[in-house]
Structure formats: structure tokens, C-alpha cells
Amino acid sequence: MKWATGPGGSRYTSFLTGTGYDVRLMRLDASGAPMWKSQSVLVEDRALSSTTDYGLASDADGNAYVCYDMGASIMLASFDPAGALRWKKTVGAGQVGRVTVASDGAAWACFIEGSATRVQRFTADGTATLGAGVLLNETGASMFSADIQPSENGAVIVSCVRYTTFTGAKILRAHRVNSDGTKPWNAIGNSVFTAGSLQFGNFPSFIADGAGGAYFCWYATSPLQCFVQRMNASGAVQYGTSGIAVTSTSSTERVSPSMTLGADGRLYVFWSQHTPNSSIYGIYGQCFAKCARQWGNDGAAVEPLATVYSRTWATAGRVGDAVVCFYDDSPSAVQDNIECARMNADGTVSWRTDVATNSGVKYRLTSVPGTADGALLAWQGGATVGASDLFAARIGADGTLGAPPAGTPGDLNGDGVVNAADLSILLAQWGGSGSADLNGDGSVNAADLALLLAAWTV
């Protein structure tokens, strides 16, 4: 299940369904209600017996982009806010399609091709601009794409898992590709870390730092420990050659880190922690600023080590300006409880909320910022082991669950009144999409103008 921002406070979500792993796309309003008559639209009717990961992104005009595999081909499909297909293109032949939107509005896709990664750029009308695409490779090594995020000036950064032998060490390399297809960093990419190895089959995601660079987090083996790294827009690492460990000790196992960039500009990372050869699990976090750990050498306890069935899926999130950690607290193999803890700046827990404690299993937690200082959380699960229904919830900055408070219809600038300033915003978006699409039909038009005028503040 993937998420992307939609216009007017909405969110796009995509998911796989059916016996052939069909790809579907849905748009939800701020209260979580489907905005399309059919609820979801079919992106691709597939007849696959297995599938790989895929990507979802959106642009400033509210259009959605889904990149996925169709047998041996990688496809990129674009939909408008009303759920209509804008275009669909074949990106190339390979596996594991991923997508992002650059600062200039172009959509970028990357995928694994043989032992290398290929990258392509598309304009708003679906025209590929880089010929056969840009190849990211290294002689004698495999270079498999893990994620793609925007950089600056229309460029993107692509992270790749690099290794020379199947059982050998697996590290991360980062490549920057400019809008004209040039690669200003090392031809074989810049190493995110050089010491240690990723877990086999782990392809960690990363996030843009807002300044043309990126933050990375991952966990290494022998010992199982989490690390973070920052690379600037020039490709220079900021946290040493191999990053900074989340703690100064390695007596317990730390895996599956998740990170978010706080409103204060600091990096927050959360992970699952386990005492080896035991049933002792915990959820911990660390804050980084100025290349240093801020929550002590051992990090902060979100949920202290204790004897339970398991504690997993530590997932970083934002509720307004605050940072939260969602996680799974499991008392048994057939019962998972999703919790959310809001963290204070000093690493203490401000509040803790039960998100979902109903009977059944819950896994694959994902989180994205919501509207009105809230956050959205989604997961898979169901009443029985192996169930894979999709669920979502919204949590507010005060820890309460549910839809955001009802605002003033037509108050586009959030000043509490509907007046000429809001009318100006609506007219500037006329014919397109955006926050002035008050009825959620994908276009700012006369129907939205009527709603705004009906709410005009006397």
C-alpha cells in the first residue's frame, strides 16, 4: 500500500488486489472517504503469479503517477485528480519500478535492468526525454535500484544496492541524475557507507533533505545495528565514511529503521530492538542534529525492552510539528496491537494512543502526514493469520483518532473567514486542480465558486 499527496487536502493510495496482483488507485478526502464514484480505479489488470515492489508519486497539479511491472515490462501510468487516465507509457524491460516527481514537475522512473539500473524522465504529457534512459552500472558489480527521490534544479537522486558476489557485502551507492541525463557525481555512484553489509534482500528507502541532498537509514549485519547518513547536493557524505550508528553499543539487535525529518530540521529515527536469544523486545528512537546523537548513547525508549511475543514495524511519522512513532505491540502470534507515541524534543513520550487493538494480525505499517496537524497510518491485516485486507486511520496532534475538525468551507488561506483573499486563490487555480477544488471533482470551476460564495463571510 502506497501513499501520495492529492489536491485539496486529499491523499492518493494505491494497492495490489485480486488473484493476478492487479494495481488499483484510490483518492481519499481529508476525512478518509473515497472521492471517486467507483471508489478506486484500475491501473492495470494483471495475471501474475508473483510480483515485485512498485512506486506511487504525485505532482503539484494533483496528478498521480504509478510505476509497476507488467510481466517483463515496466509501466508508468498517470491519473488526474478525477481518476481519469492521462497517459500510460512503457518505461523499459526489467523489474521493480519506482517513481518520483522532480522540482520542475517532471516524472522520473527507475527500474532494475539485468545487473544495472535504468532511469528515465517524462514530461507532463508523458514524453520520455532521455532517449533509451540513463544507465547506472559498474563493471563487475550489480547495481540494483532501491529508491528514487527529488534533488534540486529538476534532478533526482537514485539509491542502489551494490555488490560483487551473491554472498558478498552489499552496500548503498547514490547517483544524481540531472534533467538532461548527465551524472555529476562519480560514474559508479557515491558510497553511502563502505563498512558492513545490508541484510540480504533489504532495499532501504531514503528521504530528500530539502536542500538537494538526502538522508539515508539502514541496518547492517554482524552486528545487527542501525545507521544514518546524510549526503549533500554535491554528493559529499556528512556523517563520516560509513554514517553514524543510532547507539554507541551493539549488545542488542536493532533492525528495520524508519525516519522522518522534523519541523525543527532534526532527523528522527525509530527501530525495533531485541535481546538476542530471548523474547525481549522494545521500540527505540534517536534524534540527530549537527552530525551528533541528541537522545543519548542508547537512544530513547518509545516502548522499553520487555518480554512480549514481538514488537516490530517501528514507523516514523509527523503530526503537525510533532514527531510520532507508530509500532506493533504483539502479545501473541495471532494478535497485533498498533500503538502511537508522540515524542517530546528531549526523547520522552508525550502521549501514547491505541490505534488498533481489535482481534487479528496487523503488519506493513506505513505513515504519511495528514491534514489539520494529523497523520495517516495504514496497514495490512485481518482476523486470521495471513489475512491481507487494508486499513487506515488518522490521528490528531492530541492523540485522538478520527477525521480532522470541520473547517470553514472556502477558507482557502486558513484565516477563519471566506473573503476576497480566498476568491483570489480560487481564481488563480481556475481550470486546474488544487486547494480550491472544494467539491473534489478534480477541477476548479463554477461549482467550486458557488460553494465559496455560499460560505462568504458577511
What would you call each of these model-derived segments?
Residues M1-P405:
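Extracellular, repeat-based ectodomains that mediate carbohydrate processing or recognition
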Residues T400-V458:
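Cellulosome-associated attachment modules in secreted, modular CAZymes
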